[in-house]
Amino acid sequence: MLLFALLLAPARSFSQSQPVATDAAGTLIVRARALGLARSLAWRRLLHYRPNAKREPVSQVDGKGFFLAASGARDPDAELDATLRAFSAPLVPGNEDDHALCRFPARRELLDRALHFSGALHAPTCPALAQYLAELDPESVAVVYAANYLNNPASAFGHTFLRLQKQRPAVSNASDDELAYGVEYSANTDTDNPFWYAFKGLTGLFPGVFRFHSFEAKVHEYERGEARDLWQYDLALSRAEVRLLTLHLWELSATHLDYYYLTKNCSYHVLATLEAAAPRIDLVSHLNFVVLPRDTIKALYRVPGLVRTTTYRPSLRSRSLPQVVQREAPRKAPQSAHGSMRLTLGSGITTQYGSSFETIGYRLALHDLSDPPDGEMELLQVQFLDTQFRYDLGERSFTLNRLTFAELVALNPITRREAPLSWRGRAFGMRLHDRGCSDCFAHGLDLGFGATLASDDQHLALFVMADAYVAFSPSLDGIRGSFVRAGVGPYAGLRVRLPGNTLGLLTANWAYLPAQKLHGTYDVRATLRSALSPDVALGFEAALQPDSSELQFASYFYF
């Protein structure tokens, strides 16, 4: 609790005061310029400078108090000069915690390695910083991955955070978890409205902050409260790198970095912070423009020898599953998963116009029930911005065939101990082929709830749901002749994992259409997909609607 009080104290607010330069500061500035420290990778990473579109350095830290120069967010040279001036400024008795040497200990550590000025400057005691370091006193660092959690939109892709392992005191009966701290970067949210939440999260309108937690309490929350499996990756960092990371987290805990749900999120800033502490490692460059938590783990493995050991921590629910499921846990490690994005190329035939077609598709994220299963929760589907275009060779027309904005499916099998609800929800755009909408593109929302029966290893799953949807299209002959269609009815499916990393999925739904000329419609789909590697798959897809049937062969590339 002492640590949390320190990090929330008013004294942690940074100001932009500009101390007057002294002779000592001038000498240090001349030496720093001669050494080119402002251009060094270590300095730029410590202040989170990244090149913008014009290849100019811009810091990703958005709290103004983090910078001592007025132009510091865009000028590494000016910020370095201002830092050295601030380090040389006189102490104010009784207010040492506000001095730059106490506020920016990671900068002090980094610059002293090159300039060796510690003996020439005053040495403030920094009471708050000293208590912080005594409380943490870490000897090692790990990255922890928490599996997907669909009940919280911010965790639909999973979550990553840091574990700081405190050195064990000479006399202590505490467990390692009790001695550890968790450090995460997350958004400071101010709304429960899902639409406003999504808008602010996607556009960087939430400030993102670094928070410290009791690691034991965090594990309890994930493993018991949210039934989320954890994977812990212990890193091979030197003691000097661990210390610099600890000092840098002190600096970051007093500022904010704007939070972007798909890009500058928990995963991105965990890696950027590790790079700041250990400039020898290169992590952020291995990320796509959309950053998902499991991408963090894959990036760690791009640095040879960085991951020292891996520990799987199953949730309470996972520990209650049959042994055959628990034995497959190593295959579910996030570093084994396919790439988050997907490119699809296909060729097929359709009865709609009696011709063949070519398709190209792109999915922003993440996984469907037919994708390669390694590194994934067996019966979970999370998709965002799944787009498919089609060129009809007979009609010589290029059309948008599908646009799934978001689709979440959680098939939770009924067991002897519990009967959890299975559900799915999606915001979609797709082509309808029936008498109420012949080859028209409709947007809609779909929601279903039901039950799932599965084998012990979950390789065979049967699910049934009560489904309801609403669709909109100017071409629809909908409710009382309007452009709105509403439908309710059963939705069912069968998923089977076959030998050789092959998956089969069959889904079917029939919908009653109230107050409409067309009283009912149906949609049946079948997929057979075989993974050649974690990032390449081949497969067949078939679809049947009242006025159309089609079959296509497709190649899938994950990256």
What are these model-derived regions, one by one?
Residues K54-L136:
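Low-complexity, highly charged intrinsically disordered N-terminal segments
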Residues D137-A227, Y362, Y391-L403, T415-P420, ...:
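Glycine-rich catalytic cores of cysteine/serine-nucleophile enzymes that process amide/ester linkages
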Residues S347-Y353, L366-D368, D386-E395, E407-L411, ...:
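Transmembrane beta-strands of outer-membrane beta-barrel pores
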Residues S336-H338, Y353-F357, G394-L400, R416-P420, ...:
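Transmembrane beta-barrel outer-membrane domains
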Residues L129, A147, T263, S267, ...:
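Outer-membrane beta-barrel initiation region
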Residues A337-L343, S356-E358, E376-L385, T415-G425, ...:
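Outer-envelope beta-barrel architecture signal
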Residues Y362, A526-R529, D547-F559:
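Outer-membrane beta-barrel "beta-signal"
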Residues F215-V290, L460, A471-S475, E541-A542:
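Active-site nucleophile-His-acid catalytic modules used for acyl/amide transfer and hydrolysis
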